[in-house]
From Swiss-Prot:
Official protein name in the record: Neuronal acetylcholine receptor subunit alpha-7
Coiled coil start-end: none
Endpoints of the signal sequence: 1-19
Inhibition and activation profile: Activated by a myriad of ligands such as acetylcholine, cytisine, nicotine, choline and epibatidine. Oligomeric amyloid-beta protein 42 activates specifially CHRNA7:CHRNB2 nAchRs. Activity is modulated by positive allosteric modulators (PAMs), such as flavonoids, with a wide range of chemical diversity, pharmacological sensitivity and efficacy. AChR activity is inhibited by the antagonists alpha-conotoxons RgIA, ImI and ImII, small disulfide-constrained peptides from cone snails. Alpha-conotoxin PnIC selectively inhibits CHRNA7:CHRNB2 over CHRNA7 homopentamer.
Disulphide bridges: C147-C161, C209-C210
Classification via CDD domains: LGIC_ECD_nAChR_A7, LGIC_TM_cation
Source organism phylogeny: Eukaryota, Metazoa, Chordata, Craniata, Vertebrata
Species assigned in the record: Bos taurus
C-alpha cells in the first residue's frame, strides 16, 4: 500500500517537472528570433486579418456640459500569428501560452474619438496564444469618448454616442479590421440612463496622407434618459408654480398681494431655469424641451404681472381722471361681461328712473311750499328742503352709463330750477338756507357720481381678471400638453419611468 502511494506521488512530480520543462522550452523556442515589430504573416503582400469586438459593462457617466461619455469596456481582438505556432505533440500538456505586453506583435487599435488625457485608456494585459497561432487580446479600460449630446428633447431624450476604433498606423492593405457583434450580456444597469442597444458598423475611409484605405469599426451606443428624477425635481414643481401664477387673477385687488405673488412666481421660475442651464451644454444648436417649457411659463407669468398692473390701475382709478371711454365700456362691460356671464353688483336692484315728461326733479316746488307756509314753519324749512331732496328722482343721461337716476342729474337743470324759485329779498334767512341746500345737494350729487364712476372701473377690473384667468388657464394647459408631449418618446418614458 505504501509502495503504491509512493509510486503515484513520484509519477505526479515527474509529470509536473516534465510539463514545466516543455513550457519553458516552448517559450524559448517561440521568442527565439521573434521580432515584435514584424507583422506576423506568411506573405508580406497579404493583409493580416484582425477581428474586433467589445463587451460593454457599464455606462459610468454622461457629461452633457462637456459632451463626454465615460464607459467601462472590455475590448476583444483576435488574430493569427504565423510565428507563434507549434506542434502540440512535441510539447505535451502545453495548450496555451501567455505573452506580456511588448514581447510579441499586437495591433495598435485605438479609440479615435477619445477624450482621455492619455488617449489610450486600456490596461495592457497578456496575450493568450494557442498551438495554432491564434492570439486573443482582451484589454479592459475606462474609456472617455467625445459624444455630441443633443439636448433638444431633454429630459425625454435619446442619445446616440459613437465609439470609433481603428488601427493608428496600419492601413487596409496591411491590416484588415473585421467587426464582430458587441456583447452586452454582462451590462450593469445605470440609474440615470437605460441602454437601448449597441450597433456596430465597419467602414473604410481615405485620408489625404495615404492612398490605401483605413478601416475602422464604429459602435453606436444608444441610451435613453430616465426621466423620473427630472420629472420630480424640475417638471412637477414647474407645473405647480405655473398653476400658482393663475391664482394672481383670483386674489382681490384690495388685498395688495397680486403683484407680490406674480413677482415671486417669476423669481421661482428663474431659479429653476438656472438649474437647467447649469447641466446643459452651452450650445446654440437647439433649445432643450424643458427650457422651452420654462420660457413659455415665464412669458405667461410675466404677462400676468403686466395684466395685474392694468387691473390694479382700473380698480384704483381716480374718479377725477374722467369717465370710462365708450369703447372700453362696450368691450368690457357689455361683450366680455356677457361672454363671462358676469353681472354688476346691484344690477338687479335698480331704482326706476323717472320719466322725462311726467315726474322731474323740482326744487322750486319745495321752495314754493316752504314760502307759502305760515311764518311759524320757518324753523322747519331745512327739514322741508331735505324731504324734498330725498324724494327727488332724475332721469339718467344717455352717455353716463349709470343706472341710478339720482346720480346722473344734470347740474345745469337743477340750478335753473333753484334759481327760478329764489325767495324774495326780504327773507334773507330762507335764502341762506336754500343756498346751503343747493350746496349739500351738489355735494351728494358729485359723491354719487364719483361712486358710480369708481364702480364702473372696479367692475371692469373684475371682468379683466376673470377673462385673463380663463385665457391664461387654457394657454397654460395647451403649453404643458403641447410642449411636453412633442417629445418622440414621451409616452414610452412616462410608461416606463413613472409606472
Amino acid at each position: 500500500m505504501r509502495g503504491s502511494l509512493c509510486l503515484a506521488l513520484a509519477a505526479s512530480i515527474l509529470h509536473v517537472s516534465l510539463q514545466g520543462e516543455f513550457q519553458r522550452k516552448l517559450y524559448k523556442d517561440l521568442v527565439k528570433n521573434y521580432n515584435p515589430l514584424e507583422r506576423p504573416v506568411a506573405n508580406d503582400s497579404l493583409p493580416l486579418t484582425v477581428y474586433f469586438s467589445l463587451s460593454l459593462l457599464q455606462i459610468m457617466d454622461v457629461d452633457e456640459k462637456n459632451q463626454v461619455l465615460t464607459t467601462n469596456i472590455w475590448l476583444q481582438m483576435t488574430w493569427t500569428d504565423h510565428y507563434l505556432q507549434w506542434n502540440a505533440s512535441e510539447y505535451p500538456g502545453v495548450k496555451t501560452v501567455r505573452f506580456p505586453d511588448g514581447q510579441i506583435w499586437k495591433p495598435d487599435i485605438l479609440l479615435y474619438n477619445s477624450a482621455d488625457e492619455r488617449f489610450d485608456a486600456t490596461f495592457h494585459t497578456n496575450v493568450l496564444v494557442n498551438s495554432s497561432g491564434h492570439c486573443q487580446y482582451l484589454p479592459p479600460g475606462i474609456f472617455k469618448s467625445s459624444c455630441y449630446i443633443d439636448v433638444r428633447w431633454f429630459p425625454f431624450d435619446v442619445q446616440q454616442c459613437k465609439l470609433k476604433f481603428g488601427s493608428w498606423s496600419y492601413g487596409g492593405w496591411s491590416l484588415d479590421l473585421q467587426m464582430q457583434e458587441a456583447d452586452i450580456s454582462g451590462y450593469i444597469p445605470n440609474g440615470e440612463w437605460d441602454l437601448v442597444g449597441v450597433l456596430g458598423k465597419r467602414s473604410e475611409k481615405f485620408y489625404e496622407c495615404c492612398k490605401e484605405p483605413y478601416p475602422d469599426v464604429t459602435f453606436t451606443v444608444s441610451i435613453r434618459r430616465r426621466t423620473l428624477y427630472y420629472g420630480l425635481n424640475l417638471l412637477i414643481p414647474c407645473v405647480l408654480i405655473s398653476a400658482l401664477a393663475l391664482l394672481v387673477f383670483l386674489l382681490p385687488a384690495d388685498s395688495g398681494e397680486k403683484i407680490s405673488l406674480g413677482i415671486t412666481v417669476l423669481l421661482s421660475l428663474t431659479v429653476f431655469m438656472l438649474l437647467v442651464a447649469e447641466i446643459m451644454p452651452a450650445t446654440s444648436d437647439s433649445v432643450p424641451l424643458i427650457a422651452q417649457y420654462f420660457a413659455s411659463t415665464m412669458i405667461i407669468v410675466g404677462l400676468s404681472v403686466v395684466v395685474t398692473v392694468i387691473v390694479l390701475q382700473y380698480h384704483h382709478h381716480d374718479p377725477d381722471g374722467g369717465k370710462m371711454p365708450k369703447w372700453t365700456r362696450v368691450v368690457l362691460l357689455n361683450w366680455c361681461a356677457w361672454f363671462l356671464r358676469m353681472k354688476r353688483p346691484g344690477e338687479d336692484k335698480v331704482r326706476p328712473a323717472c320719466q322725462h315728461n311726467e315726474r322731474r326733479c323740482s326744487l322750486a316746488s319745495v321752495e314754493m311750499s316752504a314760502v307759502a307756509g305760515p311764518p311759524a314753519t320757518n324753523g322747519n324749512l331745512l327739514y322741508i328742503g331735505f324731504r324734498g331732496l330725498d324724494t327727488m328722482h332724475c332721469a339718467p343721461t344717455p352717455d353716463s352709463g349709470v343706472v341710478c337716476g339720482r346720480v346722473a342729474c344734470s347740474p345745469t337743470h337743477d340750478e335753473h330750477l333753484l334759481h327760478a324759485g329764489q325767495p324774495s329779498e326780504g327773507d334773507p334767512d330762507l335764502a341762506k338756507i336754500l343756498e346751503e341746500v343747493r350746496y349739500i345737494a351738489h355735494r351728494f350729487r358729485c359723491q354719487d357720481e364719483s361712486e358710480a364712476v369708481c364702480s364702473e372701473w372696479k367692475f371692469a377690473a373684475c371682468v379683466v381678471d376673470r377673462l385673463c384667468l380663463m385665457a391664461f388657464s387654457v394657454f397654460t394647459i395647451l403649453c404643458t400638453i403641447g410642449i411636453l408631449m412633442s417629445a418622440p418618446n414621451f409616452v414610452e418614458a412616462v410608461s416606463k419611468d413613472f409606472a
